[in-house]
Design a protein with these regions (language model features):
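Short beta-strand scaffold segments in enzyme catalytic cores
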Residues: 17-23, 125, 139-141, 147-151
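Glycine-rich phosphate-binding/hydrolytic loop that grips phosphoryl groups
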Residues: 123, 305-344
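N-terminal beta-alpha supersecondary unit
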Residues: 5-80, 86-90, 119, 123
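Glycine-rich phosphate-binding loop plus the immediately following alpha-helix
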Residues: 143, 154-198, 222-233
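A contiguous, well-structured pocket-lining segment that forms one wall/lid of small-molecule binding clefts
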Residues: 35, 192-275, 282-298, 325-328, ...
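Conserved phosphate-binding catalytic cores of ATP/NTP-utilizing and phosphoryl-transfer enzymes
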Residues: 1-5, 116-138, 320-321
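Short glycine-rich phosphate-binding loop at a beta-alpha junction
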Residues: 78-88, 267-281, 303-306
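Conserved phosphate-binding/catalytic loops in two-lobed NTP-binding clefts
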Residues: 116-117, 274-275, 292-317, 331
Length: 357
């Protein structure tokens, strides 16, 4: 029996310091041996958002311990690691540089291959950590830095169907939470506040809802929230605005996902249609429920990665590393960090297409 590859993954693209070790079974299914994520919420809380320099400093302080814990938890010895995969972009350049430099040095020190991973590709392939998915599938990536519809055709083969033309959905959640007085990161709390409010209290705008194909826009919605928040006087009004915001997001995603279904079907002549949702906002239960029902109505299989691999993590980075390792797709140690690194290099450049991070 041949030795199965053991891949160390490292992720420091924003405000999570993460490391993971994965391998695969005899059927080629990935097995997560460890997946350690250290959040920096307390570091950035008083500033109401991520401060790049503080994030990078925190990565530098933690990276060695996080990688050591990932190795310890996996029960794997350093000498048995077959390759090191690190996020090289997109992201905050000062943060990317920490994990990328550490990964290169680690790989060099044990004389093993180094693999540079696109953070978005990690999200795109993350469902394969827990599901036996066949290509192609339609992916909705919704996170703090990215909001995209992608036709995932295979490793390294992606066609962008739509993206945000301004702000990412996760950013819209966090900014709305901040305006309502919710502590950073407030995005996840919006859903809980929404449960206490009336979703019909405010008629909020749905930018480019009837144009732009699969493209998304949230800046106008964010501006409307800003104006209304200045008039709010009671806690119940805050709950009502949170509920109205949540409802509006669901309506936008429902309409745009229907359009994405049509675009995906035009590009792929297949029987089994699969819709995958990944990224931190995929943890929102109301959005999940709405999209699951939409899939049932349109004969799509819906796939949501577990909550622990929806947000930024290193298991998804190691997953891409594993796929590339088997194809001997290695990188040189001078591979640069890329603050902007779209999956679909041929897609039209848009401001929101992976630029903000």
């Amino acid at each position: 029996m041949s030795k199965k590859p053991l891949i160390l993954g490292i992720e420091t693209s924003c405000d999570e310091t993460a490391a993971s070790v994965i391998t695969e079974n005899d059927q080629g299914k990935p097995i997560i041996l460890s997946n350690i994520v250290s959040s920096q919420t307390d570091v950035h809380k008083e500033f109401g958002g991520v401060v790049p320099e503080l994030a990078a400093r925190s990565h530098i302080e933690k990276i060695d311990l996080i990688v050591k814990k990932a190795l310890d938890d996996s029960g794997i010895k350093i000498k048995d690691i077959d390759a090191v995969a690190s996020t090289a972009g997109p992201g905050l350049i000062v943060c990317l540089s920490v994990g990328l430099s550490f990964g290169k040095a680690f790989a060099s020190s044990i004389n093993k291959p180094f693999i540079a991973v696109n953070h978005l590709e990690g999200h795109a392939l993350s469902p394969k950590l827990v599901s036996n998915l066949n290509y192609p599938y339609l992916l909705l990536l919704i996170s703090g830095g990215h909001s995209q519809y992608l036709n995932v055709q295979g490793l390294g083969k992606y066609k962008r169907l739509g993206t945000t033309i301004d702000d990412a959905l996760g950013e819209a959640f966090d900014k709305t939470a901040k305006l309502l007085g919710i502590e950073f990161p407030g995005g996840p709390q919006i859903e809980r506040w929404a449960e206490k409010g009336d979703p019909n209290s405010y008629d909020l705008p749905k930018p480019i809802i009837n144009k732009g194909g699969c493209n998304l826009s949230f800046a106008g919605l964010k501006t409307a929230i800003l104006k209304i928040s200045k008039t709010i006087e009671t806690e119940q009004e805050k709950f009502n605005l949170a509920a109205s915001f949540q409802k509006t997001i669901e309506e936008i995603l429902k309409k745009k996902t229907k359009i994405a279904f049509n675009e995906f079907e035009k590009q792929n002549d297949i029987q089994g249609k699969i819709f995958v949702v990944a990224g931190g906002v995929a943890a929102n239960k109301k959005i999940r429920s709405m999209l699951i029902n939409l899939c049932k109505e349109n004969n799509y299989q819906s796939v949501f990665p577990p909550i622990e691999i929806c947000g930024d993590n290193a298991a998804m980075i190691a997953m891409v590393g594993l796929e590339k390792y088997k194809l001997k797709l290695f990188n040189k140690l001078d591979h640069p960090a890329k603050p902007r690194w779209p999956l679909d290099e041929n897609a039209l450049f848009l401001k929101g297409a992976g630029v903000k991070l």
